[in-house]
C-alpha cells in the first residue's frame, strides 16, 4: 500500500512546494515510485512537473481530490500531496486520508501562527504531523527561538535559506542535481531519512 504524505501550510512563502519537490527528487533517485498530487490553486507543483517532464503529477481540486489521491496510490508506493493554503474542507479531508502531514515553516512568528489550524486539524484527524523549519538563515538565533514556540512535533532536520533551491525549481530540477555535493543536498537527504523513519 502506498504511503500518502501531505505538505500543508496556510501561509504563502513558507516553501511548502519547494520542500516537496526536493524530497520527491530524492525519493525518486532512491528508487521509489513517486506520484504527485497538486491541490494548491497556484499550481506551482504542476508547473515544476511540466518543466521537468516524465513526472507522475495530477492537478486536482475539491470534488476530485480524494479519488485522484487514491488513484495515485494505486500507481505508486509514495504519494506526495501539495495541499491548498486555506484551512477548509478539502484540506481536512486530505489530512484525514494521509499517513503523515509535513508542515514547512520559516522561523518567523507569522509562519508559526499560520501553522496552528493545520496542527489542530491533524490532531483532530489523528494524523501524525511533523514541522520542518525551512529557509533558515545561516546566522542568528531565529531557528532556536522558533523551536521554543512551536507546539507540535518539530524535526531536528531543517532546510537552510539557499538560492540553489529557487534556481533548481525554476528549471524543473532539484538542488541536488545542480549541486550534488552541497549543503543543500545534504539537508534534503537528512530530512528524507527523518521522514522515512516515521511510521
Q: Which role does the model predict for each range below?
A:
Residues 112-134:
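Conserved C-terminal guanine-recognition region of P-loop GTPase G domains, centered on the G4
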Residues 41-43, 109, 136-140, 163-164:
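Conserved nucleotide-binding/hydrolysis micro-motifs of P-loop NTPases
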Residues 86-108:
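Inter-motif core of Ras-like GTPase G domains
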Residues 36, 81, 103, 131-133:
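Structural beta-sheet core signal
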Residues 4-14, 21-92, 120, 166-177:
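P-loop/Walker-type NTP enzyme "switch/lid" segment
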Amino acid at each position: 500500500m502506498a504511503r500518502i504524505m501531505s505538505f500543508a501550510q496556510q501561509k504563502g512563502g513558507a516553501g511548502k512546494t519547494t520542500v516537496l519537490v526536493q524530497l520527491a527528487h530524492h525519493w525518486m533517485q532512491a528508487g521509489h515510485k513517486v506520484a504527485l498530487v497538486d491541490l494548491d490553486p497556484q499550481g506551482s507543483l504542476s508547473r515544476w512537473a511540466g518543466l521537468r517532464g516524465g513526472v507522475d503529477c495530477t492537478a486536482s481540486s475539491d470534488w476530485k481530490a480524494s479519488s485522484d489521491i487514491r488513484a495515485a496510490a494505486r500507481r505508486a508506493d509514495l504519494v506526495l500531496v501539495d495541499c491548498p493554503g486555506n484551512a477548509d474542507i478539502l484540506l481536512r479531508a486530505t489530512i484525514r486520508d494521509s499517513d503523515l502531514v509535513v508542515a514547512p515553516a520559516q522561523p518567523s512568528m507569522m509562519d508559526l501562527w499560520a501553522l496552528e489550524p493545520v496542527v489542530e486539524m491533524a490532531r483532530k484527524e489523528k494524523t501524525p504531523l511533523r514541522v520542518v523549519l525551512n529557509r533558515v538563515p545561516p546566522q542568528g538565533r531565529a531557528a532556536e527561538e522558533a523551536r521554543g514556540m512551536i507546539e507540535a512535533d518539530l524535526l531536528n532536520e531543517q532546510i537552510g535559506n539557499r538560492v540553489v533551491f529557487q534556481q533548481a525549481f525554476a528549471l524543473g530540477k532539484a538542488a541536488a542535481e545542480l549541486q550534488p555535493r552541497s549543503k543543500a543536498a545534504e539537508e534534503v537527504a537528512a530530512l528524507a531519512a527523518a521522514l522515512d523513519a516515521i511510521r
